[in-house]
Amino acid sequence: MSIPVAQACSFLFVPATHPERFQKALASGADMVIVDWEDAVAPADKAGARVALLEAALTLDAAQRARLLVRLNAEGTPWFADDLAALAQLMARGLAGAVVPKAEHLPTLQAVAHAAGARAALLPLIESVAGLDAVDALA
């Protein structure tokens, strides 16, 4: 059963480099599963992690895809632009939305929102003093 992201109480992270774990994570009882492209993925594996999630999304049913979020790499990293392109494809396949790490600037959230589309949930992570200072603008 899928619930709106805004009502989710539990989130489980799973590395995108291990698509064999996606089903287990979805069956864990967590309300939402966050497939991680950021910290759980080595730099050399970033492109493969995007492909793994894109391919895995094709094997999941609509209710399962609606419980998936993807944690992007932060803006300013070499992977951010490619993450946004892949995010657009994933949203077309019915994923719930994106987790935006190190959120500090409104234009970053706007870029993610543009790539993800109007129905996407965006969960900005405030991880720095700069993000905390900008929290009103980010809301």
Locate each region found by the language model.
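Conserved alpha/beta-domain cores
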Residues: S2-A139
